[in-house]
Amino acid sequence: MNNILYIGPYKENTGMGRSARRHIDALGYNFDINLSIRPIYFTPYLDTANESGKDYSEFEDNSSSYYDIVIQYGIPNCFEYKKNFGKNICITDIDTFNIKHTGWVDRINLMDHVVVQSEWSKKSLEHAGLKTKVSIIPEPFNLTQFHSNYDTLFKNTNNDFVFYYIGKHQDKNNIKGLLSAFFLEFRKHDDAKLIIKTDMSGFDHQEAEKIITYDIQHVEKVLRVNGNHVQAPHVIIGYYEQEYIMRLHNQCDCYVNVCKAESFGASAIEAALFDKLVITNREIGSNSYINSYNGFEIESMLTNVTSKDFYMENTFTVYEQWKEPFIDSIREQMRKAYETTKIEKQQKLKNFDKDKFSETSFVNNIINL
C-alpha cells in the first residue's frame, strides 16, 4: 500500500478546486492507497456551501510518518520539494505559451516529476526550459455519472439543435467570439439555439447580467446584425450545483470550445463523455483528446495575450501567447456539427476513448510514474 500526501485547493469553488476534488475522489477510494490530504488556497472563492457535496474529513484527519508519494497540485510558485519523503510529484495547469518570465519552471525543475493534462501544456513547459520528467495524464472522472437519466432542464418542443458552452466570462474563454460566430452563421428561422452558462468572479448576479447583456448587444453592433433577425442566446448566470451542469450537458447537442488558452478543458471532456459532439480550438488543452477524428477542430493562430483578467501579476501578460480562433472557422465547424448525420455522429463518438479518463486509469498512471 502506498502512503500518499495530496496538497491541493480542494476547498475552493473554482476550476482548480473541482479538479482537486476529482483527484481526491480517484486516489482516496482506492484500496491500494492510504491517502492524507491538506488544503492550499489560491483564491478567496471557497466552496462554503459544499457545492461538491464531499466530506473529506477522513483524509484530512489521516497522517503517516512517511509518505511514498507527495503530490502538490496548484500554481508552481508554491511548490516545495519534500526531501524527507519519497517521490515528489507536482500537477499544474499551464494555459498559455511563453511563460519563462513567471519563474514557474525553476520551481518545477526541483520536483521529481511534473504532470500536465495536455500536449499544449507540455510544449509550453519545455519551451520555458523544463528539465525534470514530464507526463501527460488527463483528469479523472467518475464515468458512472455520465448517463441519460437526468431530468430535463429546459423545454425544447421544436427539437432544436442546441449548441452550448460552460465557462467564466473572461477574455481567454472568448465568449464574444462564440457569439459572433453564432450570430453570423445562424438566423432566427434556423432550428439552432445557443446556451451559455457563465459567471463573473467579483460581480454579483445583477452586475454580471448587465455586463453580459451589454457585451451581447456590443457584438451585434460590431457585426452590424439586427438583433430582431438573430437567434438570441440563452445565458445562464451564476453558480450552480454539479447536478445542474450534468443536466445541461445531457440535454444539449454540441459543446463549442472556443477558448484561446486552457490546460485541459474539463467541460469539453464532460460533454464528450455524455456522447455530445464537441468543437474545440486547435492545439489548446482539450485538443489533445478531441480532434477531427472524434469531433471538430477550429483553425487558429498564435498571438500575444491581451487580457484584463489575471489571478497573479505575472500571468496572462502580453509576453505570453495563446491561440486566437478564426471566426470563419468557428462558423464552419458549427455548421458541420449542425449538419452531421446520425451515422457520422455515431462514428465520431465511437472514436472517443472514454476509458483514459477513468479514475482507475488516473491512479495507475500516477502510481507508475
Predicted regions and their residues:
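N-terminal pre-catalytic "stem/leader" segment of glycosyltransferase-like enzymes
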Residues: M1-Y67
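Conserved donor-binding/catalytic core segment of Leloir-type glycosyltransferases
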Residues: L5, K155-N173, L179-F182, L194-I196
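Extended catalytic core of nucleotide-activated donor transferases of GT-like folds
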Residues: L5, P44-A128
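Acidic anion/phosphate-binding donor-loop and adjacent secondary structure
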Residues: G103, P140-N159
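Nucleotide-activated donor-binding/catalytic signature segment of Leloir-type glycosyltransferases, i.e.
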Residues: H205-E243
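Aromatic "clamp/platform" in nucleotide-sugar-dependent glycosyltransferases that forms part
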Residues: K260
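Short hydrophobic beta-strand element within catalytic cores of glycosyltransferases
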Residues: L277-T280, F296-E297
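A charged, aromatic-enriched C-terminal amphipathic alpha-helix characteristic of glycosyltransferases
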Residues: Q321-E332, E339-N368
